[in-house]
A protein has these predicted regions:
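Class I S-adenosylmethionine
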Residues: 2-12, 16-110, 118-127, 228, ...
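Short internal beta-strands
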Residues: 134-139, 289-297, 309-315, 336-341, ...
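The AdoMet/dcAdoMet-binding core of the Class I SAM-like
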Residues: 25-58, 63-72, 103-108, 112, ...
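Acidic/Gly/His-enriched mid-domain segments of enzyme catalytic cores or analogous surface patches
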Residues: 144, 148-228, 302-394, 597, ...
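Acidic, Ser/Thr-rich peripheral helices and adjacent loops at domain boundaries
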Residues: 154-157, 312-317, 325-333, 416-430, ...
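Polyanion-binding loop/helix "lid" in catalytic or ligand-binding cores
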Residues: 426-473
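Long, compositionally biased charged/polar accessory segments in the mid-to-C-terminal portions
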Residues: 461-679
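Glycine-rich phosphate/pyrophosphate-binding loops
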Residues: 297-298, 305-315, 391-418
């Protein structure tokens, strides 16, 4: 468009009514007449069925006017009521945006935008193969409809290089699933939500909401990735130490198969301050519904004589074991204690001889054992999330939450009366139950809430209804908020007293097979990790003196272009060892420990990789930063592998002892661990 549009005068002259601009897309007898729209819709259907269906069903719209000039790139869209338009000059504005973005972000694999505009900018940006993924959130459905009728984005949508969200449908759960993908994870630190043009300032509140949801998703993803190698090693140690107890005990899969779809309603009992007022109602309805108690709730239920069917626990620390100190043989009869295999040995000691079901979490370090009979349960960091997932797996169609405050009570209490621990002081706020006002919460509780919201969103696809009957605390999006008594009167009407079948412990022959299988996995893991460690140490000893010399030159201001070839050679040596680590047959034993050892360094490397380097000296300086980070990268990986090797060897003693006792092996070939090793 060669000149600025005179808003009011041009309406009805050079404009094309939205209905006219989209006449090719009108559907007659279920057929799409516009081939561009048809191709786009078919591609979009693969990534967002709901949005595609909504667009397919749209008829004539009249909120926006479309202006098309002689140049096919000269497309503007105007709000008919406010006379606000997306571009001052479509061709120039798009060219300027493209030039500015490519100058600053041309090496960014992932980019985020608020506003689709006329779609041409994203078509142009994706000509740069470096941009692997572009995510666009558009607040106006009609604008999406217009663009998909005018611009062929079918290849970009089908390949998912362009991911398109309609703001009204977009939520935290969708963003989390996107961000959690490998190609997004590494570039988390590069997140920036660009506003397409000033036109989208009219949607400031929505932009802020979308930005917050993306930020929350990234934060949750980073938390889920784990940020402590010590925590991971404790988990590995506990899991391997507990293998004999898990394999010879009750099987999680056997339990689920035996009890699947036997009950419609599950009540998950947490220890929030609101639990006190729910106990009488819980006692009344416990015989007619599945009761899943969190570990911390168990002593409270024991005290009030309310018998749960399951008690869940996921923590690896010794403090959790205190919840199981008190035993009541009659009360505990037929209760299944569903506990993550990475729990502390004292927790196991305190629970036994009760019905203990150790379960494997869906983590790579536990997947390698291929013990499907004992897993998989426990995504997230909270036993409340574990309990919700258990309720879902058992086939319940109604899941009721009580005591799930995830916030401080008005009087400052963090847990129900009788709970063993108090929550540390923090000052974060979130939307209150009922949607009115805010309540004080903590960073950890907020992460638990995020996981709940993700699980609830997934459960809806299986027609599972989630009721938050806490009647206090924080709002959990996606859950139906109703009083506990009202919900239970409805769900338990005409229900009979439950009578759930039990299972036996795993047969000896099956246990023997899995014990030997675990031993072989550990043996192979140690062998591959030791090989990888030696290769990394070899490269480390070669390149670090060279890197240190180059860093010295940098500190002295003596960096020149002549260093380029030397830096490339160092970088290539590092790349070779990286290629070894990601070999398919090695990766399953290396990926977890390597990823957590260098996670934050990888985020820094991602920032370096996208930095501009147009001149020769810029390229040299960028490579210096690159190899400098890799010096610590190599050191961290070697250290992480060594810690995993020693932890695994030491933790395997229980397994070796059990194998020898059963006559399955005569001696171990795992090698001796360093008794004084500490992580």
């Amino acid at each position: 468009m060669s000149k600025k549009i005179d808003k009011k005068e041009q309406i009805g002259k050079s404009s094309i009514n939205t209905k006219e601009a989209k006449h090719k897309a009108d559907s007659q007898a279920g057929q799409i007449q516009n081939p561009i729209f048809e191709k786009n819709l078919q591609a979009l259907f693969q990534q967002d069925e709901i949005l595609a269906a909504r667009l397919f069903a749209m008829g004539a719209q009249d909120k926006y006017e479309v202006f098309i000039g002689k140049d096919p790139l000269d497309i503007n869209i105007i709000d008919r009521k406010s006379f606000k338009y997306i571009y001052e000059n479509p061709i120039k504005d798009t060219h300027d945006m493209l030039e500015s973005l490519e100058k600053q972000y041309k090496r960014y694999p992932i980019m985020y935008f608020y506003g689709l505009g006329n779609g041409i900018l994203y078509k142009a940006l994706l000509c740069n193969e470096t941009h692997q993924r572009i995510v666009v959130v558009e607040p106006e459905l009609e604008i999406i409809y217009i663009v998909l009728n005018l611009i062929d984005l079918s290849n970009e949508l089908a390949s998912e290089r362009l991911t398109l969200f309609y703001s009204e449908f977009a939520n935290y759960s969708q963003f989390y699933y996107l961000i959690a993908k490998v190609e997004f994870n590494r570039y988390a630190k590069l997140y920036d939500l660009h506003i397409h043009t000033d036109f989208y300032d009219n949607f400031a509140d929505d932009y802020q909401r979308i930005n917050q949801e993306f930020t929350k998703a990234i934060s949750q993803m980073v938390a889920s990735s784990g940020n402590s190698i010590d925590d991971m090693l404790i988990g590995i140690k506990n899991h391997i130490e507990n293998l004999p107890t898990m394999i010879t005990g009750y099987s999680y899969v056997d339990l689920v198969k035996k009890r699947h779809n036997l009950m419609d309603t599950a009540i998950i009992v947490a220890t929030g301050p609101s639990l006190d007022k729910q106990l009488n109602t819980l006692k009344k309805f416990a015989p007619y519904a599945t009761v899943i108690s969190l570990d911390a709730s168990y002593p409270i239920l024991l005290k009030h004589g309310i018998k749960p069917d399951y008690v869940t626990s996921i923590e690896r620390v010794v403090a959790t074991s205190s919840f199981f100190k008190h035993k009541n043989k009659e009360f505990d009869k037929d209760i299944y204690f569903i506990v993550a295999s990475l729990t502390h040995k004292q927790t196991i000691k305190n629970i036994l001889p009760r019905r203990l079901v150790l379960t494997i979490r869906p983590q790579p370090s536990e997947f390698i054992f291929d013990l499907k009979k004992y897993g998989y349960l426990g995504i997230g960091h909270s036993t409340a999330n574990q309990a919700y997932q258990l309720a879902r797996v058992l086939g319940h169609k109604n899941i009721v939450l009580i005591g799930q405050d995830l916030a401080f009570a008005p009087d400052g209490k963090s847990h129900a009366t009788g709970h063993a621990f108090a929550q540390a002081e923090e000052h974060l706020y979130t939307k209150a139950y009922g949607g009115e006002g805010e309540v004080r919460t903590t960073y950890v509780w907020d992460k638990f809430k995020n996981q709940f919201e993700k699980d609830i969103e997934e459960s809806k696809k299986e027609d599972i209804a989630t009721y938050n009957c806490t009647e206090g605390g924080a709002r959990i999006e996606g859950a139906i908020e109703k009083p506990f008594l009202e919900v239970m009167n409805k769900l338990c009407k005409d229900k009979k007293v439950k009578n759930l079948p039990n299972i036996n412990e795993v047969k000896e022959k099956t246990a023997n097979r899995y014990l030997l299988q675990s031993y072989k996995v550990i043996s192979e893991k140690i062998k591959i990790q030791e090989l990888a460690k030696s290769k990394i140490e070899e490269v480390f000893l070669k390149v670090v003196p060279q890197i240190d010399n180059i860093l010295k030159l940098r500190d002295e201001g003596k960096v020149t272009e002549k260093l380029f070839d030397k830096l490339v050679k160092i970088s290539n040596q590092i790349d070779k060892v990286k290629e070894f680590i990601i070999k398919e047959n090695y990766q399953k034993f290396l990926d977890s420990i390597v990823s957590i050892s260098i996670y934050y360094q990888e985020l820094e490397l991602a920032k370096i990789s996208v930095a501009p380097s147009d001149t020769a000296i810029e390229k040299v300086n960028k490579l210096i930063e690159w190899v400098e980070i890799h010096k610590y990268w190599l050191f961290s990986v070697a250290g992480g592998l060594n810690a995993d090797i020693e932890t695994t060897k030491k933790a395997s003693r229980n397994l070796i002892k059990e194998l020898k006792k059963r006559g399955l092996i005569e001696k171990s070939n795992l090698g001796k661990s360093k008794d004084n090793f500490r992580f």
